[in-house]
Curated annotation (Swiss-Prot):
<feature type="transmembrane region" description="Helical">
    <location>
        <begin position="267"/>
        <end position="287"/>
    </location>
</feature>
<keyword id="KW-0472">Membrane</keyword>
<feature type="transmembrane region" description="Helical">
    <location>
        <begin position="162"/>
        <end position="182"/>
    </location>
</feature>
<feature type="transmembrane region" description="Helical">
    <location>
        <begin position="126"/>
        <end position="146"/>
    </location>
</feature>
<dbReference type="GO" id="GO:0005886">
    <property type="term" value="C:plasma membrane"/>
</dbReference>
<keyword id="KW-0812">Transmembrane</keyword>
<keyword id="KW-0961">Cell wall biogenesis/degradation</keyword>
<keyword id="KW-0573">Peptidoglycan synthesis</keyword>
<dbReference type="GO" id="GO:0050380">
    <property type="term" value="F:undecaprenyl-diphosphatase activity"/>
</dbReference>
<protein>
    <recommendedName>
        <fullName>Undecaprenyl-diphosphatase</fullName>
        <ecNumber>3.6.1.27</ecNumber>
    </recommendedName>
</protein>
<dbReference type="GO" id="GO:0046677">
    <property type="term" value="P:response to antibiotic"/>
</dbReference>
<keyword id="KW-1133">Transmembrane helix</keyword>
<feature type="transmembrane region" description="Helical">
    <location>
        <begin position="231"/>
        <end position="251"/>
    </location>
</feature>
<feature type="transmembrane region" description="Helical">
    <location>
        <begin position="203"/>
        <end position="223"/>
    </location>
</feature>
<dbReference type="GO" id="GO:0071555">
    <property type="term" value="P:cell wall organization"/>
</dbReference>
<dbReference type="Pfam" id="PF02673">
    <property type="entry name" value="BacA"/>
</dbReference>
<comment type="similarity">
    <text>Belongs to the UppP family.</text>
</comment>
């Protein structure tokens, strides 16, 4: 039985690593894979299972931090500066890197404030299968709209051409994504595209902006709930964290390599299919009714 539980921990870590930064909603996938199928709360207990999800989310966040480590060092004025994306040699000599710490802070403010105000309400009232399905579907439609608009934009901007207004608007959309299932990256990448960034630039800024917020939020949650971790469950937590970190590294790098080519519509279609599948399980078979 212990081996089976460890395998379940690895599976959940893999799912977290694949979905946390992809525009498909990690919350929706956790409901499907854990709450409807693996049910970690049955062998860990509800509080310990909640803490486990915090730990594997940290695995994904550390993966994103590693992928963007050079960017973060540059933003903090540590380390060597690379060429600015979207600028020629003359512009590079006359202009500093456009993306800086203030851009990130401006983008973080809306979600940070609303998170402090409404986090408990959202956790208590909005984490249910029907609300997550709504978030998945509405988010998919928003992504399709963004992709259709992006076709009309000539010479979309790179991440180093972003301005403070764009950063703030993208930050507001990150706050909207507090609705479970909407997807932080789906919302912010779509908004970035609507603000005339290219898909890769919108994705870069999304991940850079998300890392400090998620580190702070997950870190605070872990401080509140670390006492729920049982010594016997530590191998479960370690394997889940390592799985989320490793798979997260691969998923983030692959996503950033492909996003300018494939755009958002394939992810939107996948989300709609996922909604249909969850709806069949929930309304047709009653699976997840107690969530």
């Amino acid at each position: 039985m212990f081996i089976i539980e460890l395998i379940k921990g690895i599976i959940l870590g893999v799912v977290e690593g694949l979905t946390e930064f992809a525009p498909v909603s990690s919350t929706g996938h956790m409901i499907l894979v854990d709450d409807m199928w693996l049910k970690s709360s049955e062998f860990l207990g509800s509080q310990s299972a909640f803490t486990f999800k915090i730990v594997i989310q940290l695995g994904s966040v550390f993966a994103a931090a590693w992928v963007f480590r050079e960017r973060f060092l540059e933003i903090l004025h540590i380390g060597k500066h690379k060429h600015v994306e979207g600028q020629n040699d003359q512009q590079r000599r006359s202009k500093p890197r456009r993306l800086n710490l203030l851009h990130v802070l401006v983008g973080m403010v809306p979600a940070g404030i609303l998170g402090l105000l409404f986090d408990d309400f959202i956790e208590e009232h909005l984490f249910s299968v029907p609300t997550v399905m709504i978030g998945l579907f509405v988010g998919a439609i928003y992504m399709i709209i963004a992709d259709k608009y992006s076709v009309k934009v000539k010479n979309p901007q790179t991440v180093d051409q972003i301005n403070y207004f764009q950063a703030f608007v993208i930050g507001i959309s990150q706050a909207v994504a507090m609705w479970p299932g909407f997807s932080r990256s789906g919302s912010t990448i779509s908004t970035g595209v609507l603000m005339k960034l290219n898909h890769k630039a919108a994705s870069d800024f999304t991940f850079i902006m998300a890392v400090p917020i998620m580190l702070a939020a997950s870190g605070l949650s872990l401080l509140k709930h670390y006492q729920d971790i049982q010594i016997a469950d530590i191998p479960f937590y370690i394997l889940g964290f390592l799985a989320a970190f490793t798979v997260g590294l691969i998923a983030i790098k692959t996503f950033l390599h492909l996003i300018n080519k494939i755009k958002l519509i394939p992810f939107a279609i996948y989300r709609i299919v996922l909604v249909i599948f969850i709806a069949i399980l929930y309304f047709g078979f009653g699976i997840g009714k107690g969530i």
